[in-house]
Amino acid sequence: MLHKAIINLIILTAPTFCYSDPKVFILGDSITHGFGLPEEEGLVNQLSNWFSNNGTAVSFINGGVSGDTTAGGLERLSWSLTEDISAVIVALGSNDVLRGFPPEITKENLSEMIDIAQGNKVPVLLIGTYAPGNYGEEYKSNFDAIFTDLAEEKNIAYIDSYLKPLLDEVSKGKDVMHLLQADGLHPNPHGVRVVVEYISPQLLKFLQETNIIE
């Protein structure tokens, strides 16, 4: 009798291991990967810390590959999308611009990625990017519209850009070099912190609205 009571007590008080934190896979390029930064200062780790500090446990999986395009992301997504993935963030497109990909190709690749995730009943959040003006107004207009168009067509969540807060400062005539690495392209740890403070509330809302977290 005592033995049975002890077993029951263990069952009632033991931690439950059948549940784990939701896993969010971030499919991206160098900013997601944490190019030029120690792992602890990279975007994924800082993102995890933001959620932890705000009382929400989420496991972010770093699917960033420096230099990757939407074509590369499309190739990687199917085998990266394991059964334990709760949601996918797609943050690709910058390297398509650098290589001069036609906007319609980028859109097609992103559309296929979204279809793959939705086909597996995995919610998707799309993070956009902006084309520079040196490709011409038509290219920039067509490219920049990809992400908002897809978000509407596929009925998915959308964040305009990782770098939106930095670009906003530039548009005000402010210098943001103190937030960038020596290459002038990739955010340094302070820049990543600015990015995380910008995207995290929007990401939190997405995870709540898709019932991934309460």
Q: Where are the model-predicted features located?
A:
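N-terminal signal peptide c-region/cleavage motif recognized by signal peptidases
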Residues: 13-15
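Alpha-helical cap/lid subdomain in secreted, periplasmic
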Residues: 56, 72-214
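N-terminal helical cap/lid subdomain that shapes the substrate entry/recognition surface
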Residues: 67-71
